[in-house]
Structure formats: C-alpha cells, structure tokens
C-alpha cells in the first residue's frame, strides 16, 4: 500500500506545479513548485518539454539554471521560499536556462557573499572589529582588511564609525566576515566613511532600484546639489551635501521616490531647481 500512496503524492505535487515561464512577473508564494523548460533538440519533434528541474547532469546536460534569492533546489524540485514576483534573466551566451529569482520587498537583510554594505562598528575585540550590518548577527572585520594595514600601521577605526565594505564569507553556518579591500588589495572606495553626513535606512527594493543601470533618480538628484553618496545593499544610504539643509532635502527625496511616479519626481525636482 505504500507504493500507490507515494505515486499518488507525486502526482498530486505535479498537479500543483506551474510552468515558470507562464508566471514570470506574477506573485508566487512560499511552497509553490515550479516547472522549468528542458531544452532537448530544438529542431527535434516535440520541442521543449515542461518537467520538474532535474539535477542529474546526464538527464539534463544542456540546461544550466541558476537559482537566485527566493528559490531553492530540493532534490530534483525547484521550490519558492519567499513571497514576491518571479523574475528571469536570459543567459548572455544564449544557451542554458538563465537566472530565476523572486523579487520580494523584505525588510530584513540577509548577508550575501560579495554584497557591498554599510556597517556600524559596535565593539572591538582584540584584532577583530564587530560591525552591525542589519543582519541576524554582527559581522567580523579584521584590522588587516584595510588597504596598507600592517601590525605596526593599524587603521584608525573607533566604535561608532561607519564602515563601507563587502562580504567575503556569508552563509547560515558561519559568522559573516567583511573586508575593506578588493581582490587586488586596494580600497577602491571602501573603508571608514567620513564623520559628517547623514545615514538613513530604506527598503531593500529601493536600494536595488537605485543601483540599477537605467535608474534616472540618481542622475536627477546629482543635478540639484553637489553631493557624496554611498549605497549599501543592506538598505542603508549615507549622503552628504554642502549644508545640513541640502543633506536633509536629498534624504527626504530618496526616501519618498520609492512611491512616486516619474511625473511626480519631475515636478518635485523642477520646484527644487527653481528655489
């Protein structure tokens, strides 16, 4: 009796699954199962066949699908773990399945290897700084992770300083680790942020929107006042203008632009330019 029950469970799971290409741009919920197109012989009979993602290299040797945030491989299945809109990016070479991910409006930041973030130094323990990055636990930062730092020439980092760096270790089983140098040992803009300026927090979705290559908001903001600005993938923005009033205006604009249309932004920028 166990065998018919397992077959019935598999058929029930397959009936609930939906083809990923039919729900692109739509809202998906945690627990949903997605079916990805398996590329066999494009010229052959039948064309592409919708079936659950298989991790067997021999069974699916010509398809390489990358799962981004919000998706998880579970055996030979692809499951949704976050609520949001399903997105897809075609591969640059034109072969393979591309990248699938879920675009969600989550507020809590989860450290990801390679992300550039803004942190706050909360403590110093021996040769390690503890940095608050907005995650579930603080990140560790070695004093040797700065450009030109040696045992004799230590960086001037104090508790309360703002740090702009990137993650080199970020997984669920280990403490996040940050550095302020790139692979060549150069700072490349990372390190201790200036004492002046204003630090504020926005949603993670707004950060991704502002860092998009085709985003016009930063170009419009740059035309108003001379400014310095730093974006952290953990939802933090540091901005500095010539005066405190200009700094506050820029911060308010960036916070409000998430819920404004393009025409509304143009009206606000035109009023500020006239004033």
From Swiss-Prot:
Subunit structure: Component of the RNA exosome core complex (Exo-9), composed of EXOSC1, EXOSC2, EXOSC3, EXOSC4, EXOSC5, EXOSC6, EXOSC7, EXOSC8 and EXOSC9; within the complex interacts with EXOSC5 and EXOSC9. The catalytically inactive RNA exosome core complex (Exo-9) associates with the catalytic subunit EXOSC10/RRP6. Exo-9 may associate with DIS3 to form the nucleolar exosome complex, or DIS3L to form the cytoplasmic exosome complex. Exo-9 is formed by a hexameric base ring consisting of the heterodimers EXOSC4-EXOSC9, EXOSC5-EXOSC8 and EXOSC6-EXOSC7, and a cap ring consisting of EXOSC1, EXOSC2 and EXOSC3.
Protein name in UniProt: Exosome complex component RRP40
Family of the protein in this entry: Belongs to the RRP40 family.
Chief location: cytoplasm
Disulfide bonds listed in the record: none
Keyword annotations from UniProtKB, A to Z: Acetylation, Cytoplasm, Disease variant, Exosome, Isopeptide bond, Neurodegeneration, Nucleus, RNA-binding, rRNA processing, Ubl conjugation
InterPro entries to which the protein is assigned, alphabetical: Exosome_RNA_bind1/RRP40/RRP4, KH_dom_type_1, KH_dom_type_1_sf, NA-bd_OB-fold, RRP40_KH-I, RRP40_N, Rrp40_S1
Signal peptide region: none
Gene Ontology terms: cellular component: cytoplasm; cytoplasmic exosome (RNase complex); cytosol; euchromatin; exosome (RNase complex); nuclear exosome (RNase complex); nucleolar exosome (RNase complex); nucleolus
Example of a GO biological process term: isotype switching
GO molecular function ontology, one term from the record: 3'-5'-RNA exonuclease activity
Organism: Homo sapiens (Human)
Free-text function comment from the UniProt entry: Non-catalytic component of the RNA exosome complex which has 3'->5' exoribonuclease activity and participates in a multitude of cellular RNA processing and degradation events. In the nucleus, the RNA exosome complex is involved in proper maturation of stable RNA species such as rRNA, snRNA and snoRNA, in the elimination of RNA processing by-products and non-coding 'pervasive' transcripts, such as antisense RNA species and promoter-upstream transcripts (PROMPTs), and of mRNAs with processing defects, thereby limiting or excluding their export to the cytoplasm.
Disease / disorder: Pontocerebellar hypoplasia 1B: A severe autosomal recessive neurologic disorder characterized by a combination of cerebellar and spinal motor neuron degeneration beginning at birth. There is diffuse muscle weakness, progressive microcephaly, global developmental delay, and brainstem involvement.
Coiled-coil intervals, chain numbering: none
N-acetylalanine carried by residues: 2
Taxon lineage: Eukaryota, Metazoa, Chordata, Craniata, Vertebrata
Subcellular location: Cytoplasm; Nucleus, Nucleolus; Nucleus
Cross-link (Glycyl lysine isopeptide (Lys-Gly) (interchain with G-Cter in SUMO2)): 151
């Amino acid at each position: 009796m166990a065998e018919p029950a397992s077959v019935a469970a598999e058929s029930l799971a397959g009936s609930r699954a939906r083809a990923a290409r039919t729900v692109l741009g739509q809202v998906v919920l945690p627990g949903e199962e997605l079916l990805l197109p398996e590329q066999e012989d494009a010229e052959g009979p039948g064309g592409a066949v919708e079936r659950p993602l298989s991790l067997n290299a021999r069974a699916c040797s010509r398809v390489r699908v990358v799962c981004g945030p919000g998706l998880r491989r579970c055996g030979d299945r692809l499951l949704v773990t976050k609520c949001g809109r399903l997105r897809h990016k075609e591969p640059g070479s034109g072969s393979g399945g591309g990248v699938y991910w879920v675009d969600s409006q989550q507020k809590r930041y989860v450290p990801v290897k390679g992300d550039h973030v803004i942190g706050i130094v909360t403590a110093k323990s021996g040769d390690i700084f503890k940095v608050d990055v907005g995650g579930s636990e603080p990140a560790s930062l070695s004093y040797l992770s700065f450009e030109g730092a040696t045992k004799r020439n230590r960086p001037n980092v104090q508790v309360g300083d703002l740090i702009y760096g990137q993650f080199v270790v970020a997984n669920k089983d280990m403490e996040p680790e940050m550095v302020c140098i790139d692979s060549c040992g150069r700072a490349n803009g990372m390190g201790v942020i200036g004492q002046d300026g204003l630090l504020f927090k926005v949603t993670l979705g707004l950060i991704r929107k502002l860092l998009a290559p085709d985003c016009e908001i930063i170009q419009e903001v740059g035309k108003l006042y001379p400014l310095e600005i730093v974006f952290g993938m953990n939802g933090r923005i540091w901005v500095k203008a010539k005066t405190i009033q200009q700094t506050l205006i820029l911060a308010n604009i960036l916070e409000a632009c998430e819920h404004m249309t393009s025409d509304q932004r143009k009206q606000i920028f035109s009023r500020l330019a006239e004033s």
